[in-house]
Amino acid sequence: MKKSVTVGVSVVMLTTCLAAYAQPPHTHRLEATPATVVYGYYWPEAQPVLRIASGDIIDVDTLLTNTPEGLAKAGVPDDEIQPSLKAIVSEVTGERRGPGGHILTGPVYVEGVEPGDVLEVKILSIQPALDYGYNGCKGFLPENCEAGAPAKIIRLDRRHMTAEFAPGIVIPLRPFFGSMGVAPAPELGRLSSNPPGRHAGNLDNRELIAGSTLFIPVFARGALFEVGDGHMAQGDGEVDQTAIETSLRGRLQLTVRKDMKLTWPRAETPTDYISMATDPDLTAATRTAVQEMVDFLVSTRHLTRHQAYQLVSIAGNVAVTQLVDKPNVGVHVRLPRSIFVGR
């Protein structure tokens, strides 16, 4: 009889645990306000604005990288400039500003995440928050830019997800967050939001659209995830330093991955596996990104290094992610998921 009671209690406990495990993730709303953003940096000592459990979802607002004055100079009417942008630029000043130019929503502390883990960021959805974006002109070959010209305002057709650049030139829109990252290694201190790195950050990778998953190595407890720098369309290279920049709303799911160990961020999109790297030297960044893809194939597809390297040459696509986020340029390698059949 005692044995039956013990078994019964064990079954109840197991059922309770399974029921708890099966609970849907909690969804948190995170608006962009002076109290919920950082301005221009990633930092392991930053205070989190939200704490969530691993696997939870955040519905997050992000703001474009500009100022009310800059938008007004470019011709945006005052009633189309977001009040939240006005408040943040006005109130987040002095020591609260870092060396970079991005307004980033966060940091978000993910419970249970430790240095050495990987943060999985599932990009569930991305929507534009405005009917316009802008493009500046600096970057890689600034001699092509007209001196003193204001940013170009580009109206967005949110219904058809297109934008008319000029009469007869229509751009398809593929929104993504230019900056998604975690706190860097402690020895790097308060790191500018401008250059990307091992912590991800300002990757400006046009492939990270809705339906993609970004995997980021973690360097600080809780990860301290930040997101911003919304882009509606961008070419590889981002040669003039800007995309179609705008404010975005996103739904992201953040999960700790203790089963993964990464040196650099990686990603999976609906169509590709992606390795990536950054470095002040383009050749060095390319070398690392290619090697990262080789290592990925060796560990996940059980190929020899010889085979993996050959496969990258046959089926991989090496691209310059961006040339303008000084001091680092970015390179990524895409490998089609469709080549892996019958497994």
Give names to the regions the model predicted.
Residues T65-N66, G70-E111, I123:
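Extended, compositionally biased flexible segments
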Residues T65-P77, I126-G136, G222-M232, T321-V324:
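Short, Lys/Arg- and Gly-enriched loop/turn segments at beta-strand edges
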Residues P99-I103, Y109, L124-I209:
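Intrinsically disordered, low-complexity linker/loop segments enriched in Gly/Pro
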Residues P25-T27, E31-V37, E45-D59, L64, ...:
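Alpha/propeptide regions of enzymes that mature by internal proteolysis
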Residues L173-T283:
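Conserved mixed alpha/beta catalytic, RNA-binding, or beta-rich assembly cores of soluble enzyme
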